[in-house]
């Protein structure tokens, strides 16, 4: 309906397209007008040349909801792994979606997807991890204007106020992270690529779980 409801998950890309490139994953569906989270993007397909790109996460409702996670890039056997899909945009209250992980390749791993940016209250999404084969991590999203923590691998801010906000939250989070293994506000860490490690738990108050590491 117009007021609420989560967006649907995007379809996974096909195994091959012309030229041996994996198909791109479908985009996650957008949520209802006011409430609901965006759907996750579909994973890119396997390619004998390049892996397919992960689909972007859907956008949340305008008031409350988180952006959908970007789909993971597909495995590229001969050349490059697929690029992870971008995380979706949240509502006024909600977290930006995590970028998808880059696809693996014996030649060049795909780059991780870009994390979604917070709006008012909420964290930026984590940048997706780079694929095995020296893929680069995606750029993390910036937190909401009023409250939130930047996502993993977010760019350094040029705003002194934003930098102060991030430093204060990091100090507040430290004892919670040490004692409980998760922050008060913030996202969990991404699992290391190639280890199959679980993503870290999100913050006690709010935060995305980190992306799981590839096997």
Please report, for each region that a protein language model flagged, where it lies by residue.
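Collagen triple-helix signature
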Residues: 1-154, 163, 185-215
């Amino acid at each position: 309906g117009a007021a609420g409801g989560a967006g649907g998950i995007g379809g996974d890309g096909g195994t091959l397209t012309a030229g041996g490139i994996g198909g791109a994953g479908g985009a996650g569906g957008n949520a209802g007008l006011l409430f609901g989270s965006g759907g996750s993007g579909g994973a890119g397909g396997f390619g004998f040349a390049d892996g397919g790109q992960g689909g972007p996460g859907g956008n949340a409702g305008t008031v409350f909801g988180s952006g959908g996670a970007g789909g993971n890039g597909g495995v590229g056997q001969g050349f490059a792994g697929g690029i992870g899909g971008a995380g979706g945009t949240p509502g006024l209250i909600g977290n930006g979606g995590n970028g998808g992980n880059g696809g693996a390749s014996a030649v060049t791993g795909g780059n991780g997807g870009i994390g979604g940016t917070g709006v008012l209250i909420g964290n930026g999404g984590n940048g997706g991890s780079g694929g095995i084969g020296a893929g680069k991590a995606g750029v993390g999203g910036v937190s909401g204007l009023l409250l939130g923590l930047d996502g993993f691998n977010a760019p350094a801010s040029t705003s002194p106020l934003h930098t102060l906000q991030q430093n204060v939250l990091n100090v507040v989070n430290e004892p919670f992270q040490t004692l409980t293994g998760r922050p008060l506000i913030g996202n969990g860490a991404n699992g290391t690529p190639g280890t199959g490690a679980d993503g870290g738990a999100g913050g006690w108050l709010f935060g995305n779980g980190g992306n799981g590491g590839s096997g």
